[in-house]
């Protein structure tokens, strides 16, 4: 295989969700597995809905995932290239002017459906006489431009779906240019894919019906169409769709929870494939395992509980250096991290344990007489991981308590929690003075 060139082409009209992230990830894994290039293209020709803050969010999300790109392009900077391609198509007769209003097209569609006919555009505009066109333009109508499809079967060998085909006669001629002169998705996308040398278009299966017109458009512009891979769309755990505008499963929300990016990459890379879902620590590992023949056509479901399990496994082996920046806790050190790490389900939970160790807490006193007696037996001097065992043995001998009756009241008084990290690691972090005050029932 020659080195592939792929592209991820989001529109900056909303936040990326995990479905978008999966498409971006699989594009990059495929390209890098074969020594190729990954292009990030922002499809921002919709000036009304595209927003710079969404564009920045896309870049931030991809950086967070580690999906660095080899080239960044913005369609809003390439309008001249699209206009030149449109002019070529007009000269060759492959696009034609249409003057129907949206209301007229909708009425025509309803009539077709009422007659049991497919709602395919009937090319009425091609039958307009010059005087009719002049009259419509005198009324102030400005044409939109449709691409004239060849009424033939279009075939391609899809990397995921296998041999695929669609007949041009089953589709309306797609509108390439709006009445205001702005471009819809199809023409800019094909022009960019040609000029950037894209060899493989990897995207969701909601684009399958776009493929036949796009293949014909590649050919009309004198180019060989790239290969296509259409992935089943990712859904939520119960089968609901994901929406970037609603923020459903948005990467922004996931990042805020402290999720490790490789937990998400490990999950998204394997969803819909025959590989078992398991932790991978680097993108290079995922690249080495990537192959199209592992992917099927079943609907993959994104389960946040599965993501959390992967994240917890990664977190429980992560060094302090790996999490320092993500912790966001001033003063936190390796001793603290190693103490709390085994008991965390989410990285954000570490902040609460930092507060327990370093900030004032109202103790929960189950048996004041017992905890005061235990306070009197706290050892002096430097504390380490052996202190807890030595101290509780002394308390046991002095009070006769053992098991839960011994340990539970001490944990409640020292941490205010029923459960948590081992107290042999927490006690040195809490310190002598704070521990004694809490055992005495004082806020400390």
Swiss-Prot record:
Residues forming the motif 'HIGH' region are 10-20
- Which residues are ATP-binding? 244
Naming one, the record's GO cellular component terms include: cytoplasm
Main subcellular localization, coarse class? cytoplasm
Any signal peptide, and if so, which residues?
none
| Top-level division of the source organism's lineage | Bacteria
**EC category:** ligase
Q: Which cell locations does it reside in?
A: Cytoplasm
Q: Does the keyword Cell wall biogenesis/degradation apply?
A: no
- Give the keywords, sorted: Aminoacyl-tRNA synthetase, ATP-binding, Cytoplasm, Ligase, Nucleotide-binding, Protein biosynthesis
Motif extent ('KMSKS' region): 241-245
Catalysed reactions listed for this entry? tRNA(Glu) + L-glutamate + ATP = L-glutamyl-tRNA(Glu) + AMP + diphosphate
Q: Return one Gene Ontology term, BP aspect.
A: glutamyl-tRNA aminoacylation
Q: Which InterPro entries match?
A: aa-tRNA-synth_I_cd-bd (IPR045462), aa-tRNA-synth_I_codon-bd_sub2 (IPR020751), aa-tRNA-synth_I_CS (IPR001412), aa_tRNA-synth_I_cd-bd_sf (IPR008925), Glu-tRNA-ligase_bac/mito (IPR004527), Glu/Gln-tRNA-synth (IPR000924), Glu/Gln-tRNA-synth_Ib_cat-dom (IPR020058), GluQ/Sye (IPR049940)
Q: Name one GO molecular function term.
A: tRNA binding
- EC numbers: 6.1.1.17
- SUBUNIT field: Monomer.
Q: What does this protein do?
A: Catalyzes the attachment of glutamate to tRNA(Glu) in a two-step reaction: glutamate is first activated by ATP to form Glu-AMP and then transferred to the acceptor end of tRNA(Glu).
PANTHER family found in the cross-reference section: GLUTAMATE--TRNA LIGASE, GLUTAMATE--TRNA LIGASE, MITOCHONDRIAL-RELATED
> Which family, according to the similarity comment?
Belongs to the class-I aminoacyl-tRNA synthetase family. Glutamate--tRNA ligase type 1 subfamily.
- Protein name as it appears in the record: Glutamate--tRNA ligase 1
């Amino acid at each position: 295989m020659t080195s592939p060139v792929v592209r991820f082409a989001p529109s900056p009209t909303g936040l990326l969700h995990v479905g978008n992230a999966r498409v971006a990830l699989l594009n990059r894994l495929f390209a890098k597995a074969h020594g190729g290039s990954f292009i990030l293209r922002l499809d921002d020709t919709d000036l009304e809905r595209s927003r710079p803050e969404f564009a920045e969010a896309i870049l931030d999300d991809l950086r967070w995932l580690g999906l660095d790109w080899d080239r960044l392009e913005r369609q809003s900077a390439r309008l001249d290239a699209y206009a030149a391609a449109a002019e070529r198509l007009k000269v060759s007769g492959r696009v034609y002017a249409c003057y129907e209003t949206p209301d007229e097209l909708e009425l025509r569609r309803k009539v077709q459906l009422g007659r049991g006919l497919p709602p395919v555009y009937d090319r009425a505009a091609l039958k307009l006489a010059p005087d009719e066109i002049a009259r419509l333009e005198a009324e102030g109508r400005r044409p939109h431009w449709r691409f004239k499809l060849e009424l033939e079967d279009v075939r391609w060998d899809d990397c995921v779906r296998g041999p695929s085909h669609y007949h041009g006669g089953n589709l309306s001629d797609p509108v390439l240019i709006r009445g205001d002169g702005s471009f819809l998705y199809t023409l800019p996308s094909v022009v960019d894919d040609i000029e950037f040398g894209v060899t493989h278009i990897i995207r969701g299966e909601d684009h399958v019906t776009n493929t036949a017109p796009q293949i014909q458009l590649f050919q009309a512009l004198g180019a060989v169409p790239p290969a296509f891979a259409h992935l089943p769309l990712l859904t939520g755990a119960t089968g609901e769709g994901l929406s970037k505008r609603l923020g459903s499963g948005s990467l922004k929300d996931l990042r805020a929870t402290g999720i490790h990016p490789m937990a998400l990459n490990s999950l998204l890379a394997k969803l819909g494939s025959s590989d078992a879902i398991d932790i991978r620590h680097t993108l290079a590992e995922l690249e080495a395992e990537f192959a199209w023949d592992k992917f099927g056509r079943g609907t993959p479901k994104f389960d946040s509980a599965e993501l959390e399990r992967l994240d917890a496994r990664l977190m429980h082996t992560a060094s302090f250096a790996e999490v320092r920046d993500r912790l966001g806790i001033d003063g936190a050190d390796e001793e603290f991290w190693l103490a709390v790490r085994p008991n965390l389900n989410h990285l954000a939970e570490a902040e609460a344990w930092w507060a327990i160790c370093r900030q004032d807490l109202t103790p929960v006193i189950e048996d004041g007489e017992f905890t005061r007696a235990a306070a009197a037996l706290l050892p002096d001097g430097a504390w380490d991981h052996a202190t807890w065992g030595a101290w509780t043995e002394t308390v046991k001998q002095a009070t006769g308590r053992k098991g839960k009756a011994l340990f539970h009241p001490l944990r409640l008084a020292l941490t205010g929690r029923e459960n948590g990290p081992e107290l042999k690691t927490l006690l040195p972090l809490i310190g002598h003075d704070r521990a004694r005050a809490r055992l005495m029932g004082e806020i400390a």
